[in-house]
């Protein structure tokens, strides 16, 4: 029984990382749009979420429609364009890759 529970735990932890990856400011450089590093994940059917700073945020409209809060609290302002945010396109592209089987 103990081995069976260990097996189930291993499967569950593996499944959690199948559709996600850790992203960082170091990886993206100045183009990194968030104030914290964290996990970018895809939840079927195409909801891209970001887990960072102890919370889960919607990165796209599909995730917002599933009830996740907007990413705005951790989305950096663009220092070269006052009133705008840093482009989130590269993160969306990476998220879409995670959504493909």
Question: What is each PLM-predicted segment?
Answer:
Residues 2-3, 28-31, 84-86:
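Short, intrinsically disordered, charge-biased short linear motifs at domain edges
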Residues 3-13:
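Sec-dependent N-terminal signal peptides
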Residues 19:
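Cys/His-rich metal-chelating microdomains
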Residues 22-65:
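Short N-proximal segments of mature Sec-exported proteins
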Residues 68-101:
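C-terminal partner/receptor-binding element of secreted or periplasmic proteins
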């Amino acid at each position: 029984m103990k081995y069976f529970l260990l097996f189930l735990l291993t499967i569950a932890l593996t499944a959690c990382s199948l559709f996600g990856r850790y992203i960082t400011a170091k990886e993206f450089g100045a183009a990194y749009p968030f104030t914290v590093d964290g996990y970018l994940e895809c939840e079927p059917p195409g909801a891209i979420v970001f887990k960072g700073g102890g919370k889960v945020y919607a990165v796209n409209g599909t995730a917002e429609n599933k009830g996740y809060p907007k990413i705005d609290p951790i989305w950096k302002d663009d220092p070269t364009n006052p009133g705008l945010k840093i482009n989130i396109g590269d993160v969306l592209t990476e998220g879409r890759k995670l959504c493909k089987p």
